């Protein structure tokens, strides 16, 4: 941390927002805000209730990214003062009203219970604003100017307009305008970054009025991927990451929920899976937990995408159904059959596997579909040699295996589509196995920019996350132990993706690098990845944050600035220092609770 403090002292309060908005203007007037400030929620569309007056609204900005934010007439839906805290609990899917209600509640909590005292962002002997004689924020107007799409709680990429505008006048009127509830939530998040806790612990203020912001994201898919199989995580661990995602305007949370090491997902119709496959019977995500996590994400405009990786990375199934898995836990020559131990792969030509997957997905998919438009079927690092031990195949010949893999993927994706979900796969299915994928399928790339270029050249939508930049677990050394006879050959025991990926490296990654201009529209966005061989609840927060925030800004603001240049570390460093402090408060205080 010694290197961060000097950067903090360089912070210009005119540019401390993260991720960086499209346009931002501010002044130097001090305004204090009280806990009883009213939130006036205005809305257009057919679902408006509690109408008490009609308010024509005009927002004018030379650089407004969304002309639809202008000249809209909206109605007062309701006024909220001192909103109750919410944990997002509920039954069924999430509506636009749910998102705005939660956003107002969490904004109030952030302003008055989780705010930042910015002492380290000023030089010594800085004179803190005094409440006496200062102006006040008199109201916060939240205006949703268009009817939300039906899919607001589980959208496909691009279905929700996430743009917003924000103004704060010297007279103390804050106005957030957006075409969707998610955009309004983003605007409220930005509003909290304009305010700071006073050292007297009784007041909250800004010294930036008047403010004018217009903003919208560069990429449609902005997320992190958390592996909850190799280490066991609690619901609260997951919720904290969702909170931080939302605060960084990330809109996807990828839950890599199962792998060879453990099966922590409870499947009520197949209880043996988690009862025998989890590290302990209590280290599971119950059906209720699973619903809670998905809804908690959706109510913050963060779509949780669940992944059950297959056919590889499935050794944990063998603890309950050994007949379904080939090459299970082979030692010591595990590297012949898998990328890492324990080995184990679903058999590729077994009717029993098909029956199992049909039952598994019939259980899981209906519990995913209220909260997500996607389901991730995995497909990475499948080792052909495992099938030499599969009595249904007995070969590692690609000519024999490829048609069987095609059949395997088709079977799974057909079932995913029947529930109205869009399949997601890892890049190997397309690039290594030459599986023909439907044009609806999202391909997730992790190995190289060249792979992204290949995927888009084939006409497929892609998610980026090059392991050389956006793998957050790298640089911690080998997690395997070596026999003394061969240990010297692995010295100094670096992992495969060393060195450690610091925020500057993460920030330097361009998701569009190497992609032909005519194919760049197929890059939906990307994810930063947290694999958990050496990460657990003890260190997960600091392993992900604030480095993932660097990826969040690239995905929201783009890798290039308005002049087409690579984004500046000089500009980013002080802003990231402040976001680090705010993320720490969000994570340390834990999930929003009722």
Regions found by a protein language model. Give the residues of each.
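Flexible, acidic glycine-rich loops studded with aromatic residues
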Residues: 114-117, 121, 423-431, 435-441, ...
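Feature activates predominantly on carbohydrate-active enzymes
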Residues: 151-356, 361-376, 527-531
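Fungal secretory targeting signals
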Residues: 1-16
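Structural recognition of the beta-strand scaffold that forms the well-ordered cores
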Residues: 31-33, 37, 41, 222-225, ...
């Amino acid at each position: 941390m010694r290197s961060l403090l000097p950067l903090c002292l360089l912070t210009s309060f005119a540019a401390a927002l993260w991720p960086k908005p499209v346009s931002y203007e501010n002044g130097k007037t001090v305004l204090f805000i009280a806990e009883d400030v009213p939130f006036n929620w205005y809305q257009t569309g057919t679902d408006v209730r509690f109408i008490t007056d009609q308010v024509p609204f005009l927002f004018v900005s030379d650089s407004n990214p969304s002309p639809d934010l202008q000249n809209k007439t909206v109605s007062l839906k309701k006024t909220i003062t001192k909103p109750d805290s919410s944990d997002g609990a509920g039954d069924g899917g999430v509506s636009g009203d749910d998102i705005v209600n939660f956003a107002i509640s969490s904004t109030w909590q952030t302003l008055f219970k989780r705010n930042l005292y910015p002492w380290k962002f000023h030089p010594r002997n800085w004179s803190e604003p005094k409440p006496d004689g200062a102006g006040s924020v008199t109201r916060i107007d939240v205006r949703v100017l268009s009817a939300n799409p039906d899919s607001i709680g589980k959208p496909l990429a691009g279905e929700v307009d996430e743009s917003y505008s924000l103004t704060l006048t010297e007279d103390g009127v804050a106005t957030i305008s957006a075409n969707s509830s998610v955009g309004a939530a983003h605007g409220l998040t930005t509003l909290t970054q304009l305010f700071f806790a006073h050292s007297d612990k009784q007041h909250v203020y800004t010294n930036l009025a008047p403010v004018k912001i217009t903003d919208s994201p560069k990429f449609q898919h902005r997320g992190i991927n958390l592996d909850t199989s190799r280490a066991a995580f609690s619901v609260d661990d997951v919720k904290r990451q969702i909170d931080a995602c939302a605060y960084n305007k990330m809109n996807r949370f990828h839950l890599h929920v199962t792998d060879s090491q453990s099966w922590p997902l409870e499947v009520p119709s197949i209880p043996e899976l988690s009862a025998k496959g989890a590290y302990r019977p209590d280290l599971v995500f119950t059906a209720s937990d699973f619903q809670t996590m998905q809804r908690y994400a959706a109510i913050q405009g963060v779509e949780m995408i669940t992944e059950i990786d297959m056919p590889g990375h499935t050794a944990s199934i063998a603890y309950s159904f050994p007949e379904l898995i080939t090459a299970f836990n082979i030692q010591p020559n595990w590297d012949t059959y898998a990328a890492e131990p324990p080995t184990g792969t679903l058999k590729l030509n077994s009717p029993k596997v098909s029956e199992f997957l049909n039952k598994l997905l019939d259980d899981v998919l209906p519990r995913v579909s209220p909260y997500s438009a996607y389901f991730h079927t995995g497909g990475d690092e499948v080792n052909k040699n495992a099938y030499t031990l599969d009595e249904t195949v007995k070969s590692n010949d690609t000519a024999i295996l490829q048609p069987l893999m095609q059949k395997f993927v088709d079977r799974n994706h057909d079932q995913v589509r029947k529930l109205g979900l869009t399949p997601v796969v890892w890049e190997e299915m397309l690039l290594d196995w030459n599986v023909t994928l439907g044009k609806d399928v999202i391909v997730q790339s992790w190995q190289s920019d060249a792979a992204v270029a290949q995927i888009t050249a084939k006409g497929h939508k892609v998610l980026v996350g090059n392991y050389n930049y956006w793998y957050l677990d790298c640089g911690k050394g080998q997690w395997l132990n070596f026999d003394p006879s061969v240990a010297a050959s692995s010295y100094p025991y670096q992992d495969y993706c060393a060195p450690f990926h610091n925020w500057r490296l993460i920030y330097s990654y361009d998701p569009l690098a190497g992609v032909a201009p005519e194919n760049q529209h197929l890059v939906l966005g990307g994810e930063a990845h947290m694999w958990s061989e050496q990460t657990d609840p003890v260190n997960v927060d600091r392993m992900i944050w604030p480095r993932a925030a660097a990826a969040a800004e690239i995905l929201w603001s783009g890798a290039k600035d308005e002049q087409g240049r690579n984004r500046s570390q000089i500009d980013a460093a002080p802003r990231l220092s402040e976001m680090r402090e705010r993320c720490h408060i969000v994570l340390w205080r834990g999930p929003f609770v009722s």
